[in-house]
C-alpha cells in the first residue's frame, strides 16, 4: 500500500544549518548522508513524499539545481512533491527556477491535497480523504480549517490548529 510522508527544511548542503538549528553532525556531508539514509529507510519507491520547502543549498542557482538533481537521484522515492521554501532557487522576479521545479512531480508555494484514511471524529466508520493544506510557512488560518481540514508547514512551526508534524 502506498504511504504518504512529510519532511521539511532538509537544507542539504547548507553548512550553516548545522549551527543555526543545532543539528548534531560533524560535517554537512554527514548530515546529508544521514537524512538521505533516513528517507530511504522509511519511504518506499512508490510512496509519496511531500517536502515542505528548503530542499537544498547552493552558492548559485545553477549549483543548487545541479545539487538537487544529484540528491533526488539518491532518494529511492520516485514521487516527490515540493512546496517551495524561502531557500529554494528563484528568478530575480521571485518565480521558482524552471529547471528546479522540473525535478519534482509537482512544485508550488502552496498545495491542497487529499490524504486518505486520516482519522477525525467525522471520519469514524468511513474511508474519507482529509483535505490537507501544505505551505512552507506556518499559516494562522488555512482553507477549510473550520471544516476539519488539517495544515502542514515547515519552517515556522506553531500551534495554530491541527498541524501535521513533518519529519522522518
Segments predicted by a language model, with ranges:
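A structure-centric signal for secondary-structure junctions around beta-strands
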Residues: 1-2, 129
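Conserved beta-sheet core of the metallophosphoesterase superfamily
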Residues: 98-168
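Core catalytic region of metal-dependent phosphoesterases/phosphodiesterases
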Residues: 2-7, 12-117
Amino acid at each position: 500500500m502506498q504511504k504518504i510522508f512529510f519532511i521539511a527544511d532538509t537544507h542539504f548542503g547548507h553548512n550553516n544549518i548545522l549551527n543555526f538549528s543545532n543539528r548534531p553532525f560533524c560535517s554537512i556531508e554527514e548530515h546529508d548522508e544521514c537524512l538521505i539514509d533516513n528517507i530511504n529507510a522509511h519511504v518506499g519507491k512508490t510512496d509519496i513524499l511531500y517536502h515542505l520547502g528548503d530542499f537544498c543549498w547552493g552558492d548559485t542557482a545553477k549549483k543548487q539545481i545541479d545539487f538537487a538533481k544529484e540528491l533526488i537521484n539518491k532518494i529511492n522515492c520516485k514521487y516527490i512533491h515540493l512546496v517551495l521554501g524561502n531557500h529554494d532557487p528563484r528568478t530575480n522576479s521571485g518565480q521558482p527556477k524552471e529547471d528546479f521545479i522540473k525535478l519534482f512531480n509537482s512544485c508550488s508555494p502552496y498545495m491542497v491535497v487529499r490524504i486518505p484514511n486520516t482519522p477525525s471524529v467525522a471520519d469514524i466508520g468511513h474511508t474519507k480523504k482529509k483535505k490537507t493544506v501544505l505551505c512552507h510557512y506556518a499559516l494562522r488560518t488555512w482553507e477549510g480549517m473550520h471544516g476539519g481540514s488539517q495544515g502542514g508547514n515547515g519552517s515556522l512551526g506553531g500551534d495554530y490548529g491541527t498541524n501535521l508534524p513533518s519529519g522522518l
